[in-house]
UniProtKB/Swiss-Prot annotation:
Homodimer; dimerization is crucial for its function. Oligomer. Interacts with CALM in a calcium-dependent manner. Interacts with TESC. Interacts (via the juxtamembrane region of the cytoplasmic C-terminal domain) with CHP1; the interaction occurs at the plasma membrane in a calcium-dependent manner. Interacts with CHP2; the interaction occurs in a calcium-dependent manner. Interacts with EZR; regulates the cytoskeletal interactions of SLC9A1 and promotes stress fiber formation. Residues 688-691, 719-724 are annotated as: Interaction with PPP3CA. The modification Phosphothreonine is found at T607, T756, T786. The gene is SLC9A1. This is Sodium/hydrogen exchanger 1. Residues 1-102, 153-162, 220-226, 288-291, 346-354, 409-414, 474-479 are extracellular. It comes from the Eukaryota. Electroneutral Na(+) /H(+) antiporter that extrudes Na(+) in exchange for external protons driven by the inward sodium ion chemical gradient, protecting cells from acidification that occurs from metabolism. Exchanges intracellular H(+) ions for extracellular Na(+) in 1:1 stoichiometry. Plays a key role in maintening intracellular pH neutral and cell volume, and thus is important for cell growth, proliferation, migration and survival. In addition, can transport lithium Li(+) and also functions as a Na(+)/Li(+) antiporter. Residues 544-549 are annotated as: Confers pH-dependent PI(4,5)P2 binding. Activated at acidic pHs. Inhibited by amiloride and 5-amino-substituted derivatives. Inhibited by cariporide and eniporide. Phosphatidylinositol 4,5-bisphosphate (PI(4,5)P2) and phosphatidylinositol 3,4,5-trisphosphate (PI(3,4,5)P3) bind and differentially regulate SLC9A1 activity. Pfam families: Na_H_Exchanger, NEXCaM_BD.
Length: 822
């Protein structure tokens, strides 16, 4: 039976071992919790709930309850004295003791993290499940099972508190997204992202709030008392796309970069709109009447929240970059500054009710180029993997606690309100994407196709941010908050399970372009930067200031001022690819000397000596070792930063101040003549003849010979070579009629007086061009193809250097082709 079950599911005992281990650990922990009377309170400020009041005495390492309870057989009483006459008996020292309250908090946190990690391992070792169901769905199911198990044994399941989510679980995910944000794709599509994030979120919030208010008016007695302000607050919570859910789903389907950055960028930037609307409607709930000034201040607060969060992030990013200048002697603490300054930016933004997500993104984007230029490669690797690990664990815990909190929370169900909420969310998303895309495509060069619009609309997933904001609602001002929370959980489960599970087959069905898995080559990087500089120059010439122009201005300012302040030492200057090459060569030479292989290399490098070192039998192996990923990444960084400075070495110009150099034309003509002479000498040395070439005449095409042979009139001051076309019997035969020129070209001059080249030859070869003319027949009856009697065809057979004579004529064709001049 076990073999049949394993064969059906494709599982083996090693694969199910992590899951069984987690189940055994949970089942074993529950009796311990029950025996010690640990009842986590759902109203606690932490995940596990509030602890009983405890007091700590001065100088003590451990804590003790304020009111200790004494038991008759308590083993912790080590100073128990039993007097029996004059003799005092003392109880033995306890070898083993249990104090769970002392380690309760870190133990439970570690257990939940261990559960999250083991669940991720278990999902990925079972490909039949992970290929069909997204990881986020499986984690929510695990949370539901764990919550039901805890509730089944009589315990209170832990609840995902909003403070824990916003202060501890959300920042690692946003920092990872902001620090490794693909900046090029993000900036190129920033306008589209802002329209979807701002206008789209506002449309969803007010459209959903207005329709739900109309439903509440006619929905029955249970929801008749829900006002317009309540539905608008609920609409602002449920309308925002969640970045955690988007990251979890879109990274598994490997969608192309454009769609990924549009949906993910929208989920990041709509936080400012969500925060403003939430606090705005929450404040309006305390007012008796709302005036025009209140609405205007609420509109102004949007810019304050968004731009204030960006400003806080930029300030902390600059401070982090400046601090990294002085960490060259203490490399161990370099990664710590990145985490601390980013987290301080988030907390500072939340302190003033600004957008903490915008602050984290801004700090990560600003600090990354300068910090990576200052820190070591090992520190960069540490930052990369720690952020990935931290964000992955936080994301896993969030989805698990969504399932646990669903079991632990109090719910209120109303079919009309919940189904209307789900239906209106889908309608608002589809209408918003269609209308906004129609407007955006009027200004985009790369249009968004109907397939792209469908993926954008279908990828609007909701997640833990909406759940946490719904949990923060005050029951005093919003008495139907339990109904709102139930509707939020329903929408989250529908988007994560239904849309998240079906988006992968839909992407395959629609043949949507996938993400390029391999990195771009260095050649592609060079050509991309080349096109950027080309477009910048075109914008300058045309007088049109697009984003390439402002990007170039920002790069110039960055190089002139910012880099000198934030990057230490010589690294603040322009990095050179040649310097990196010398560094790499020096490292290889040192390794070669240390390995003792220097004596095998001869002092004089030649082709023969290199062949002796590397025999022909090893020709298939590469002489030079392949570049490692680290070196290739460093070359990419050098090229990115170095190619941005190419235009700065040129003098400034525009279309109105073009000054011609008087010596430039003469210099170019001289260089051109030298180049022509060099090419002519090379052809003479290779083919022992002169290519018949006339620049002023049109190119001879492969036309068939008619009654009259084709001829071109040469210049009077140029020598003439008359050429007989090749006969069908000897297609390689060429008749050079001018014998003196032939001897001059071949270096076989029969006249001793013409051995030296005189002024007449220099005049003839002034331009380094030899003119060509076809031989005219002496009489109408003379055959054009008959060679002169004084020259035999075999003596005139030379290598074909003039042109390709073309294919042999077909059997039915008696007319050969005219050779085309090179």
């Amino acid at each position: 039976m076990m073999l049949r079950w394993s064969g059906i599911w494709g599982l083996s005992p090693p694969r199910i071992f992590p899951s069984l281990l987690v189940v055994v650990a949970l089942v074993g922990l529950l009796p311990v919790l029950r025996s010690h009377g640990l009842q986590p309170s759902p109203t606690a400020n932490t995940i596990r709930g509030a602890e009983p009041p405890r007091e700590r005495s001065i100088g003590d390492v451990t804590t003790a309850p304020s009111e200790p309870v004494h038991h008759p057989d308590d083993r912790n009483l080590t100073n128990l004295h039993i007097e029996h006459g004059a003799k005092t008996l003392r109880k033995a020292f306890p070898v083993l003791d249990i104090d769970y309250l002392h380690v309760r908090t870190p133990f439970e946190i570690s257990l939940w993290i261990l559960l999250a990690c083991l669940m991720k391992i278990g999902f990925h070792v079972i490909p039949t499940i992970s290929s069909i169901v997204p990881e986020s769905c499986l984690l929510i199911v695990v949370g539901l099972l764990v919550g039901g198990l805890i509730k089944g044994v009589g315990e209170t399941p832990p609840f995902l508190q909003s403070d824990v989510f916003f202060l501890f679980l959300l920042p690692p995910i946003i920092l990872d997204a902001g620090y490794f944000l693909p900046l090029r794709q993000f900036t190129e599509n920033l306008g589209t992202i802002l329209i979807f994030a701002v206008v789209g979120t506002l449309w969803n919030a007010f459209f959903l709030g207005g329709l739900l208010y109309a439903v509440c008016l006619v929905g029955g007695e249970q929801i008749n008392n829900i006002g317009l302000l309540d539905t608008l607050l609920f609409g602002s919570i449920i309308s925002a796309v969640d970045p955690v859910a988007v990251v979890a789903v879109f990274e598994e389907i490997h969608i192309n970069e454009l769609l990924h950055i549009l949906v993910f960028g929208e989920s990041l930037l709509n936080d400012a709109v969500t925060v403003v609307l939430y606090h705005l409607f929450e404040e309006f709930a305390n007012y008796d009447s709302i005036g025009i000034s209140d609405i205007f201040l609420g509109f102004l607060s949007f810019f304050v929240v968004a731009l204030g969060g960006v400003f806080v992030g930029v300030v902390y990013g600059v401070i982090a970059a400046f601090t990294s200048r002085f960490t060259s002697h203490i490399r161990v603490i370099e990664p710590l500054f990145v985490f601390l300054y980013s987290y301080m930016a988030y907390l500072s933004a939340e302190l003033f009710h600004l957008s903490g997500i915008m602050a984290l993104i801004a700090s990560g984007v600003v600090m990354r180029p300068y910090v990576e230029a200052n820190i070591s490669h090992k520190s960069h690797t540490t930052i990369k993997y720690f952020l990935k690990m931290w964000s992955s664990v936080s994301e896993t815990l969030i989805f698990i606690f969504l399932g646990v909190s669903t079991v632990a929370g109090s719910h209120q169900w109303n079919w009309t309100f919940v189904i209307s909420t789900l239906l209106f969310c889908l309608i608002a998303r589809v209408l918003g994407v269609l209308v906004l895309t129609w407007f955006i495509n009027k200004f985009r060069i790369v249009k968004l196709t109907p397939k792209d619009q469908f993926i954008i609309a279908y990828g609007g997933l909701r997640g833990a941010i909406a759940f946490s904001l719904g949990y923060l609602m005050d029951k005093k001002h919003f008495p139907m908050c339990d109904l709102f929370l139930t509707a939020i959980i329903t929408v989250i489960f529908f988007t994560v399970f239904v849309q998240g599970m079906t988006i992968r087959p839909l992407v395959d069905l629609l043949a949507v372009k996938k993400k390029q898995e391999t990195k771009r080559s260095i050649n592609e990087e060079i050509h991309t930067q080349f096109l950027d500089h080309l477009l910048t120059g075109i914008e300058d010439i045309c007088g049109h200031y697009g984003h390439h122009h402002w990007k170039d201005k920002l790069n110039r300012f960055n190089k002139k001022y910012v880099k000198k302040c934030l990057i230490a030492g010589e690294r603040s200057k322009e990095p050179q690819l040649i310097a990196f090459y010398h560094k790499m060569e020096m490292k290889q030479a040192i390794e070669l000397v240390e390995s003792g292989g220097m004596g095998k290399i001869p002092s004089a490098v030649s082709t023969v000596s290199m062949q002796n070192i590397h025999p022909k039998s090893m020709a298939s192996e590469r002489i030079l070792p392949a570049l490692s990923k680290d070196k290739e990444e460093e070359i990419r960084k050098i090229l990115r930063s170095n190619l941005q400075k190419t235009r700065q070495r040129l003098r400034s110009y525009n279309r109105h101040t073009l000054v011609a150099d008087p010596y430039e034309e003469a210099w170019n003509q001289m260089l051109l003549r030298r180049q022509k002479a060099r090419q002519l000498e090379q052809k003479m040395s290779n083919y022992l003849t002169v290519p018949a070439h006339k620049l002023d005449s049109p190119t001879m095409s492969r036309a068939r010979i008619g009654s009259d042979p084709l001829a071109y009139e040469p210049k009077a001051d140029l020598p003439v070579i008359t050429i007989d076309p090749a006969s069908p019997q000897s297609p390689e035969s060429v008749d050079l009629v001018n014998e003196e020129l032939k001897a001059k070209v071949l270096g076989v001059n029969r006249d001793p007086t013409r051995l030296t080249r005189g002024e007449e030859d220099e005049d003839e070869d002034e331009d380094g061009v030899i003119m060509m003319r076809r031989k005219e027949p002496s009489s109408p009856g003379t055959d054009v193809f008959t060679p002169a009697p004084m020259y035999s065809p075999s003596s005139q057979r030379i290598q074909r250097c003039l042109s390709d004579p073309g294919p042999h004529p077909e059997p039915g064709e008696g007319e050969p082709f005219i050779p085309k001049g090179e």
